[in-house]
Swiss-Prot record:
One of its GO terms (biological process) is protein homooligomerization. InterPro entries: BACURD1-3, BTB/POZ_dom, SKP1/BTB/POZ_sf, T1-type_BTB. It comes from the Viruses. This is Putative BTB/POZ domain-containing protein L742. Belongs to the mimivirus BTB/WD family. Pfam families: BTB_2 (PF02214). Residues 79-148 form the BTB domain.
Length: 449
């Protein structure tokens, strides 16, 4: 066939045209020519991407997101560090290191089927390919919003399990930043190089916030006056924000926000004053979230999202003869962690509790947090004393959802929440008798011993 012959390509939703010379080196396409026409069950935008690759407009990397389609046309990829996987019958071409580091599922998957490297597509992973595509966008793009369904799918793939068990041997608890602490966005920085008073890492997104812990007490003003940051070995004084002194707990903790307009990823080097001793025990965290300051308190604007080990649903059976509902906090913990897991923790924190009722109004109800200071018995109502009174605030847009409005003070967060155990109870006092189940959605964070 002459190279200048016009070939019409009927896609699944439109029609395209190209010269025979453009597709001549693709036997999978040329073999389908009938009357100078090719009919394909391929979306137009995908076919345009493939034709632009044949036209040398785009590199082969441009086709990675549509590896499933490219493979059907005989286009194979061969880049070091990349592998094929099969999600729900759709083939993805992904970076192996990224998948292993971010998703615990694939760390085990690649290890178990190592003999198949680099083509694991013969093993079906029976999950939704559309949700997996969203997960890939989340892993590779900054400021990517996730739906609740996608968050649940992340749990299936064991997304960064280290998020849920933070090792803090040298430190106590946060005062104001409990919401930050529970944020799904936190990631351990495991590739950070700590040498003397210098920390080196890589900034992968346009904005990262680093939570940094120190072994000794620190002076915020000294840090602000003496800290230095280099981006790609160039001194920078505009990309640093150390949050105010009120957000330091035990004088061992700060937030640093780094922003860069440089081409990403870029190398970051943070140098602290000589008197500063940095902890190297997995105590550096990075996150990519927006934060705003309200009444002197930094709040994570995405803190309402729940993830694995957070947001479990707990059903409470209520005696219809009572005008109050009593919930042992221990039940909230054992509903998530088994006894073997709990034994590994020094504390488990519970926060962000939302009550969901079944067509029943909790209007006029109020909440008390009580504690038995005499013994460790689980049923401690008789000897308990009230340590905090809280109000129930109706969640926006819902008639049946109520959030506990805890008094947000340093003393309460520090002295109560970190010590939740079997002798704490949440008591909901009602105006009317309650009938039916009560559902709770809440967060937990486990602190290793």
């Amino acid at each position: 066939m002459d190279n200048n012959t016009v070939i019409t390509i009927n896609t699944s939703d439109d029609t395209l045209q190209t010269y025979y010379s453009t597709i001549a080196k693709c036997p999978s396409l040329t073999s389908l020519i009938n009357d100078n026409t090719i009919s394909l069950n391929i979306r137009t935008n995908h076919m345009v991407m493939i034709l632009n690759y044949f036209r040398n407009i785009n590199s082969i990397q441009y086709l990675y997101p549509i590896a499933n389609v490219a493979r059907k046309l005989g286009i194979e990829f061969n880049e070091d560090g990349y592998v094929y996987i099969n999600i729900g019958g759709k083939i993805f071409y992904v970076e192996k290191k990224l998948m292993s580091n971010k998703l615990g599922y694939f760390e085990a998957f690649f290890r178990n089927y190592n003999q198949l490297d680099p083509d694991y597509s013969s093993i079906l992973i029976d999950r939704c390919p559309n949700l997996f595509a969203k997960i890939m966008s989340f892993l590779t793009m900054s400021n990517q919003e996730l739906s609740g369904t996608t968050r649940l799918e992340l749990q299936y793939y064991c997304y960064n399990l280290r998020n849920y068990f933070i090792k803090l041997e040298h430190f106590k608890y946060m005062d104001y930043l409990l919401d930050h602490y529970c944020s799904h966005n936190y990631r351990l920085v495991t590739d950070m190089n700590i040498s003397d008073n210098t920390v080196k890492t890589t900034l992968e997104n346009s904005q990262n916030i680093y939570a940094i812990f120190f072994k000794n007490r620190i002076d915020i003003k000294t840090l602000k006056d003496n800290i230095s940051i280099k981006i790609n070995n160039i001194e920078s004084n505009t990309n640093l924000l150390i949050l105010s002194n009120e957000l330091v707990f035990d004088d061992n903790f700060i937030f640093i926000k780094l922003e860069s307009d440089k081409k990403l990823p870029c190398d970051i080097e943070i140098t602290f004053p000589d008197t500063t001793i940095i902890s190297g025990d997995s105590c550096f965290f990075k996150t990519k979230f927006r934060c705003d300051k309200h009444n002197g308190i930094i709040r994570d604007t995405s803190s309402h999202n729940v993830t694995s080990k957070n947001g479990n649903i707990y059903t409470v059976d209520v005696d219809i003869d009572q005008n109050k509902i009593t919930i042992p906090v221990k039940n909230l913990i054992t509903n998530i962690f088994n006894e073997q897991e709990v034994d590994k923790f020094s504390d488990v924190l519970v926060s962000d509790i939302i009550f969901v009722t079944d067509k029943f109004s909790l209007k006029g109800a109020y909440v008390e947090l009580s504690c038995n200071t005499i013994n460790e018995s689980i049923n401690c109502s008789e000897n308990s004393q009230i340590i905090a009174k809280c109000s129930l605030k109706k969640s926006f847009g819902s008639k049946q959802k109520y959030r506990i409005n805890f008094p947000f003070t340093t003393k309460y967060i520090k002295n109560v929440l970190p010590h939740y155990s079997g002798n704490y109870e949440i008591v909901i006092n009602l105006e009317n008798k309650y009938e039916g189940p009560l559902y709770l959605k809440y967060r937990t964070i486990a602190i290793h011993k």
